[in-house]
């Protein structure tokens, strides 16, 4: 049996699209919101089964990975987050790069030699890798208009994955993947009602975020706090990415209030120095990510000062 386990953001979805459009197989999909990354523990695979893992930190899935390997499961792992110690096992195939200008969709694009490059470009744009995505688009011969459309698609796909619960999303990531797979091409999906719904939601939420101002500013970083509202939870990721573009010399932390009074945190390193975000977030129990962009799934309110201290140590030194 085949299991496809993937992050519910643009990078994870576009990675799987490339693979399955080239190699269609019946599989069990395992995915969730963008921050739901410990997905391998949900996989009940048996000896001889095959599991494909896309855009999920190996650090957060190592115990489940070791369990699957010990059970005789074959695992293909492709990712761009911090991996830690990679198991040495004959059943494990690994393609991992932690380079800040790489995402999983681009790694898959390399493996497939550009066979589904449009989806790779959309995934990279969604992961806020505008320069690498644009370079791949130019090399592949896409027009400026088509490249702009792929960028908007990638951003909207990524936007859909944010929020602490599936109820906040416009589409369950598995259903969104299904709609994209059925469309086959980005251009076909861009003409669909599903994309119009996603696009309208994105534009409304971005408009609501435009009045926000930072609650804390230091020379090297700024902190923004979003209200406990569905639109804020959905827009937190793209809002963080927009801040990086608007203020490229400083880092940003975007806090979204949760129902229990804690915060969902997105941290973006300065665009001019795409390092340190993972270092900051990994100091907290539910934190992690990559050097350019990381997050904390649940930050207790009493740890806000600790977060500001970690940001100051990393970016004001």
Identify the residue ranges that each predicted region occupies.
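Alpha-helical structural motif
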Residues: 104, 172-176, 194, 198-205, ...
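Loop-centered beta-sheet repeat module
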Residues: 133, 137-184
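Short N-terminal helix-initiation segments at or just after the protein's N-terminus
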Residues: 58, 159-171, 192-204, 234-241
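Oxyanion-binding "anion nests"
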Residues: 98-99, 178-225
């Amino acid at each position: 049996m085949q299991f496809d386990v993937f992050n519910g953001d643009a990078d994870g979805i576009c990675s799987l699209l490339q693979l399955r459009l080239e190699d269609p197989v019946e599989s069990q999909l395992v995915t969730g919101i963008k921050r739901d990354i410990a997905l391998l523990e949900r996989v009940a695979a048996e000896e001889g089964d095959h599991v494909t893992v896309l855009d999920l930190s190996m650090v957060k899935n190592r115990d489940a990975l070791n369990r699957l390997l010990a059970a005789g499961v074959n695992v293909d792992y492709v990712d761009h987050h911090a991996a830690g110690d990679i198991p040495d096992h004959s059943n494990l195939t690994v393609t991992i790069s932690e380079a800040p200008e790489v995402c999983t969709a681009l790694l898959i694009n390399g493996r497939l030699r550009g066979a589904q490059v449009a989806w790779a470009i959309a995934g990279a744009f969604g992961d806020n890798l505008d320069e690498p995505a644009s370079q791949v688009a130019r090399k592949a011969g896409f027009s400026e208009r088509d490249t702009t459309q792929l960028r908007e698609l990638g951003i909207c796909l990524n936007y859909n994955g944010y929020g602490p619960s599936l109820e906040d999303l416009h589409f369950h990531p598995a259903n969104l993947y299904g709609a994209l797979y059925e469309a086959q091409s980005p251009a076909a999906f861009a003409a669909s009602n599903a994309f119009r719904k996603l696009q309208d939601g994105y534009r409304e939420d971005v408009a609501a975020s435009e009045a926000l101002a930072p609650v804390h500013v230091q020379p090297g970083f700024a902190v923004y706090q979003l209200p406990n509202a569905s639109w804020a939870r959905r827009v937190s990721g793209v809002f963080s990415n927009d801040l990086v573009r608007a203020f490229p010399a400083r880092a940003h932390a975007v806090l979204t209030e949760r129902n229990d009074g804690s915060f969902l945190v997105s941290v973006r390193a300065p665009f001019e120095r795409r390092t340190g975000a993972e270092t900051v977030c990994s100091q907290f129990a539910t934190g992690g990510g990559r050097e350019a962009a990381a997050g904390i799934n649940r930050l207790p309110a009493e740890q806000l000062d600790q977060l500001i201290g970690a940001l100051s140590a990393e970016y004001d030194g």
